[in-house]
A protein has these predicted regions:
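Well-ordered beta-sheet/strand-loop patches within structured domains
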Residues: 1-186
């Protein structure tokens, strides 16, 4: 948030759709979460430390479940730390309404695959068969580039439903190891 500044007309932001109070509204800087989500996704792939991240209240159309990151002035923020022994460079560009974000650094002898699981939340006792939300969890699988041995596995949970509901791991299907990887371009 501090890097991008307050999203106002005076700071050069245009109005676009944004989520506010459970509704879609026009807001200066609306759509900025596409940038934070792309950066979050790249940080996951780069095995960077995720210090702070919140998903949207609603499912977004530009990223798979668990890979979005909402930001709002005075509210949720995305904070990542370069916990590597070397510097990184974040590159971002926009062409033909396509956002491209990359994190460039030194090869550390590892590669990353991402996967996610998802399931529906059934939280209303009056209507036990009606889904009231979506639970999902991204998993970062880190492998050794030389041996293909699994080095680590980290989970990043998400939930898109009323705040009163709590995430319950029993509601999500069993996590599966990824078999392939697809690049996401926003």
């Amino acid at each position: 948030n501090n890097l991008l500044g307050k999203r106002t007309k005076e700071n050069g932001y245009l109005q676009a759709d944004a989520y506010l109070g459970g509704k879609v509204v026009k807001e200066y800087g609306g759509g900025i979460c596409q940038v934070s989500s792309a950066l979050y996704y790249c940080a996951l792939l780069s095995e960077l430390q995720i210090d702070e991240r919140e998903n949207h209240t609603f499912r977004v159309g530009y990223m798979p479940l668990s890979y979005d990151a909402t930001v709002s002035w005075g509210g949720p923020d995305l904070k990542i730390t370069n916990d590597r022994a070397y510097p990184i460079r974040i590159e971002a560009s926009m062409a033909d309404k396509e956002l491209k974000v990359s994190i460039v650094g030194t090869d550390n002898g590892k590669y990353v695959k991402l996967s996610y699981t998802s399931g529906y939340a059934y939280m209303n006792p009056e209507y036990p068969d009606v889904a009231t939300g979506i639970l999902s969890e991204a998993t970062r699988w880190v492998y050794d580039s030389t041996t293909d041995a699994l080095r680590s596995c980290s989970d990043f949970p998400s939930a898109a439903f009323p705040e009163s509901a709590q995430m319950d791991a029993a509601m999500c299907p069993t996590k599966q190891m990824p078999t392939d990887f697809n690049m996401i371009i926003i």
